[in-house]
Amino acid sequence: MFYHNSSIFHPTTFFLIGIPGLEEVHGWISLPFCSVYLVALLGNVTILLVIKTEKTLREPIFYFLAILSTIDLALSTTSVLRMLGIFWFDAHEISFGACVAQMFLIHAFTGMEAEVLLAMAFDRYVAICAPLHYTTILTSRVLMGISMCIVIRPVLLTLPMIYLVYHLPFCQAYIIPHSYCEHMGIAKLSCGNIRINDIYGLFVVSFFVLNLVLIGISYVYILWAVFCLPSQDARLKALSTCGSHIGVICVFYIPSVFSFLTHRFGHKIPRYIHILVANLYLIIPPSLNPIIYGIKTKQIWEPVLRAFIKK
């Protein structure tokens, strides 16, 4: 079960329990999980197809939306397929390398989603606070630079987690009371000192907080600019362009904050609640994001409606 690596013992496999305490109803729990995953697949693929086929959707906000949908597809697939394997086929065992790989992908894609939301906030800030300079500020070169930051920064923040996990000793513990692999879930199985893992985890969380603060600052300027507009119609029109983005921010950050608080301070909360919240944090945003943008954005739902009418 364990192999030796430079005086550090690693298990050859981990055992993912799924949702501790609810093992007998895993089959029933899988139904909403599978449904939400299918909604995420259908919704995000639809968004990508509409943006690709509609020549009018070439504004930067739709470019960021396409990136968001791509990340949502990757994040939901990385997490939900492993969960369904546990629920349906009792595929609890996962190799050490595969577990670390899943940990890296989940944390990296989650970080990328936070970066995209920040980029979208910047887009809305420029569109409302400096509309005459919108096309000169958000040029193709700037969009390319932002896209690289969206990918590179989360990857660089997540890579040290691999090093930290590989340098932990694992004595006899290999059972993870979770349905997927994440950094602290693996670290807590170690019989060594995980203080550096804990500190680094908080360091990574601080970047999510920083992004949220920057988004908040951008919306302070946006609201100031909106309320300076002369007519109520102009104010409502400006605010309506931010509605979808605000909805997506809430869908992403509210479950993540709740998950963080239950993990840090909810010691009296049953373990299965912790795991369910952590699962919802990964699967709900990818399924709701395309719905929010599809309903609120006329340029998105009109082509979809035309396609159904033709059929």
Each language-model region and where it sits:
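Transmembrane helical core of 7TM receptor-like proteins
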Residues: 1-311
